[in-house]
């Protein structure tokens, strides 16, 4: 069918200056091409629906056929194995990252709670009171979160967080695997010097564009929905206090995220890459 054929082509390939098709533009194009005398967008939508076509929708992807990270498969396999193999009692896997530029916005009027027939009401106008950075580590075995807040985000602040982890993690844990991206802050000379003097810590870096492999990102999503969606904080100190309070509440009922060999196999199939996990 001509409509389906056109819907499966990019508009610029048929001489149209559009980023994507919608039902109105497809209807207009069919008439201009003299395929039909007239057709409504509603009819176009019904035909597309019968073929499960929605050319106005998009999602981002990375083709495995384009050369990128030469160690892509090795790095992915390393991280997935950490998540799925049985850890020894002396081992721990922590997923580490930063949630940056958190703004303590002070509303000009207090936020009002929900009432019957009314949602939560948030004052539209606010005052910015600077910004704060949250360093967090997610324990893949227990779901416990370690957190540190700082006004700046440099190697110095990251090392402060590493020192906190070193103090908080029991001495019987002799191997701490830290999963994190390879930002300069994570791989700079100061951090490498710290790492050389703390033998129980080992860094693992997923490939570029693989933030989805870092489990703390899932926890950041929960934090955003449950604590930061309504931003109403007097200042940076108040924001830091609320963040640490949320972490404490989370840790009272902490749970890990379920990364199984079966789920990892599905992920790798979508990446078009075979992956043999360790037994």
Predicted regions and their residues:
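A short, amphipathic alpha-helix used for macromolecular contacts
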Residues: 1-39, 86-87
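Short, basic alpha-helical nucleic acid-contact segments in DNA-binding proteins
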Residues: 46-60
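Extended, low-complexity cationic-aromatic segments
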Residues: 73-163, 269-274
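C-terminal domain-tail junction helix/linker
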Residues: 106, 238-279
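RNase H-like polynucleotidyl transferase catalytic core
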Residues: 120-126, 197-215, 231-233
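Short, basic/hydrophobic alpha-helical segments
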Residues: 156-176
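Acidic/histidine-rich, metal-coordinating catalytic segments
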Residues: 173-186
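Active-site proximal helix-loop segment of RNase H-like, two-metal nucleases, encompassing DDE(D)
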Residues: 216-238, 249-251
């Amino acid at each position: 069918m001509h409509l389906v054929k056109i819907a499966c082509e990019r508009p610029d390939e048929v001489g149209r200056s559009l980023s994507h098709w919608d039902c109105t533009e497809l209807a207009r194009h069919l008439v201009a091409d003299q395929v039909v005398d007239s057709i409504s967008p509603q009819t176009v939508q019904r035909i597309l629906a019968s073929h499960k076509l929605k050319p106005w929708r998009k999602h981002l992807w990375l083709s495995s056929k384009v050369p990128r990270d030469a160690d892509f498969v090795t790095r992915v396999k390393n991280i997935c194995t950490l998540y799925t193999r049985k850890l020894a009692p002396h081992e721990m896997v922590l997923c580490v990252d930063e949630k940056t530029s958190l703004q303590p916005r002070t509303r000009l009027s207090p936020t009002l709670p929900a009432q019957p027939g009314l949602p939560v009401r948030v004052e539209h106008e606010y005052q910015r009171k600077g910004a704060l950075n949250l360093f967090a580590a997610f324990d893949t075995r227990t779901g416990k979160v370690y957190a540190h807040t700082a006004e700046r985000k440099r190697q110095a602040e990251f090392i402060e967080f590493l020192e906190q982890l070193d103090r908080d993690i029991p001495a019987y844990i002799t191997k701490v695997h830290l999963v994190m991206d390879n930002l300069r802050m994570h791989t700079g000379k100061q951090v490498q010097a710290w790492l050389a003097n703390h033998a129980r810590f080992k860094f693992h870096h997923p490939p570029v564009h693989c933030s989805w492999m870092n489990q703390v990102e899932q926890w950041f999503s929960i934090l955003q929905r449950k604590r930061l969606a309504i931003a109403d904080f007097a200042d940076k100190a108040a924001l830091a206090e609320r963040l640490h309070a949320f972490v404490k509440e989370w840790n009272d009922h902490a749970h890990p995220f379920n990364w199984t060999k079966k789920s990892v196999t599905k992920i790798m199939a979508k990446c078009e890459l075979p992956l043999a996990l360790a037994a």
